[in-house]
Amino acid sequence: MYEMAYDIKKKLDVNFKTLNGLIKYHNSVLEEYHTKILSKKLDKTEYKLKEKWKELDDKLKNTLKINPLNSEYKLQKEGMYMKHCVGGYTKSVKTGKSYIFSIYYEDKPYTCELTMKKDIININQLYGRFNTIAPDALYKLIGDTIKQSQERIMKDETII
């Protein structure tokens, strides 16, 4: 939410007392963000994938049929369609801090953000439309694919 507010030059007002209040405030910032972003032309140029993500990118595409969200345009469109804040992660994807993709599971769309700390890949976020919680089975499916990729990297003694 911070990056969205920063991008639209909005001062955050953290005057809520309940989880419901936080969700309502998040959604109002998100709506304002989408409205302002829609008014500017989005860059469709795909970001160059950082080396540390390349092997996993191939594995995920071939195994799970994912759609990488690797441009400002794709991230914003995903956020608008899914009604969540993935559009605010443009900088994080561009710099390689995050690897974000969309995936369909049981005919429902989900958005997943992966991050890496000390060569360990983590599922940082995995949400459906309107920030609905993803099924445990999808977490397991993605996690198993990541684990297979990491085991291969360790076996080859390749450092990411």
Pin down the residues of each PLM region.
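Glycine-focused motif/segment detector
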Residues: 1-160
